[in-house]
């Protein structure tokens, strides 16, 4: 496995670790509605950071974006909006299925759809079947899905042991939402594929290869922001017990603390895709669709490890922790199989 591929896998791991931790600051926000908190954090992660970093990287911000026609920008934006719909469905999936089953089904589906649909859409799926490297990466995807399934099982054992149940368990509704979440969340993978002309244009302007994907986030995350912020604003306007005015009528020190914590959560959320861009740039172009598989499987891996560090599994017993550890090992093996496939 060459150095570039190793570093690509490493950067995806760092990005996934940030994704697994990003909600920790949000949990410390007090006396705010989820909608206000999510809007503040989202404004930082989907609007302020992508625009600011792009303005720093590009020699002429407006000239860069106006150089593309609608046929280039619209698919990127719409796939970003598609991914934003997946974000909203993610929370509803957890509500109706519980954390473990919801994450397992949603992540498993988005891992498969986001990874394999890209080469199919590009007309390159035969490369996966007819080459040794392609077959190795397919095997890696299969092993990763198995690893996600094992971690999901560990979570179910933990929830059963600790008496944790879904907020409003509904198997049929939860499964429909989980499938929708998995499919729509793959929009980020499709958006990155559609944004290749933007990456190439950034490279032509002298942007470092590690950073060429970052300007496209202005459009991708703009689509996600439209859906997420629109959802939050509609709820804040229509739901009687939600009020932005009430949220910002608290004591000033608490408001400042809540804003800073939400902004920190937004920063950590953005960093997952900052390092995703680094990992994506380090992987051979013919296998760039594997970025999504690495990101999502590492997200599950890091989520389990963060849970252990935060002692969320202390009262779960030895068996769930053992199953979790096995699942993490399987995901690590999957990443190595994919790495070897890309290097062959």
From Swiss-Prot:
The record's annotation in InterPro entries points to:
L-rhamnose-proton_sym_RhaT
- Alphabetized UniProt keyword annotations: Cell inner membrane, Cell membrane, Membrane, Sugar transport, Symport, Transmembrane, Transmembrane helix, Transport
Q: Where are its TM segments located?
A: 4-24, 38-58, 72-92, 101-121, 137-157, 175-195, 214-234, 259-279, 290-310, 321-341
Per the record, a Pfam family? Answer: RhaT
Q: Which reaction does it catalyse?
A: L-rhamnopyranose(in) + H(+)(in) = L-rhamnopyranose(out) + H(+)(out)
The record's Gene Ontology cellular component field reads:
plasma membrane
| Localization annotation | Cell inner membrane
| Similarity section | Belongs to the L-rhamnose transporter (TC 2.A.7.6) family.
Describe the task this protein carries out. Answer: Uptake of L-rhamnose across the cytoplasmic membrane with the concomitant transport of protons into the cell (symport system).
Q: What is this protein called?
A: L-rhamnose-proton symporter
Native organism is Enterobacter sp. (strain 638)
Q: Which gene encodes it?
A: rhaT
């Amino acid at each position: 496995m060459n150095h570039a591929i190793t570093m690509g896998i490493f950067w995806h791991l760092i990005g996934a670790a940030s994704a697994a931790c990003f909600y920790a600051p949000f949990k410390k926000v007090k006396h705010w509605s989820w909608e206000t908190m999510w809007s503040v954090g989202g404004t930082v992660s989907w609007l302020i950071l992508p625009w600011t970093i792009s303005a720093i990287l590009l020699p002429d911000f407006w000239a860069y974006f106006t150089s593309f026609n609608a046929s280039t920008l619209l698919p990127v934006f719409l796939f970003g909006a598609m991914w934003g719909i997946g974000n909203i469905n993610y929370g509803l999936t957890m509500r109706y299925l519980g954390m473990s089953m919801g994450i397992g089904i949603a992540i498993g589906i988005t891992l498969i759809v986001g990874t394999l649909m890209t080469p199919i859409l590009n007309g390159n799926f035969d490369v996966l079947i007819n080459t040794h490297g392609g077959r190795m990466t397919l095997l890696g995807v299969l092993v990763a899905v198995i690893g996600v399934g094992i971690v999901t099982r560990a979570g179910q054992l933990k929830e059963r042991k600790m008496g944790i149940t879904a907020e409003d368990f509904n198997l049929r509704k939860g499964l429909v939402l989980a499938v929708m979440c998995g499919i729509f969340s793959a929009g980020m993978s499709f958006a990155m594929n559609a944004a290749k002309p933007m990456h190439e244009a950034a490279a032509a302007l002298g942007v470092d290869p590690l950073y060429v994907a970052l300007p496209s986030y202005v459009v991708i995350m703009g689509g996600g922001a439209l859906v997420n912020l629109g959802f939050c604003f509609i709820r804040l306007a229509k739901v009687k017990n939600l009020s932005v005015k009430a949220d910002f009528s608290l004591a000033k020190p608490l408001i400042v603390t809540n804003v800073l914590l939400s902004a920190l959560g937004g920063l950590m959320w953005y960093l997952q895709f900052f390092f995703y861009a680094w990992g994506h740039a380090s992987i051979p172009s013919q296998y760039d669709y594997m970025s999504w598989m690495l990101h999502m499987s590492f997200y599950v891996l890091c989520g389990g490890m963060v849970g252990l560090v935060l002692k969320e599994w202390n009262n779960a017993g030895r068996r769930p922790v053992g199953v979790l550890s096995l699942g993490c090992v399987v995901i690590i093996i999957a990443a190595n199989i994919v790495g070897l496939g890309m290097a062959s």
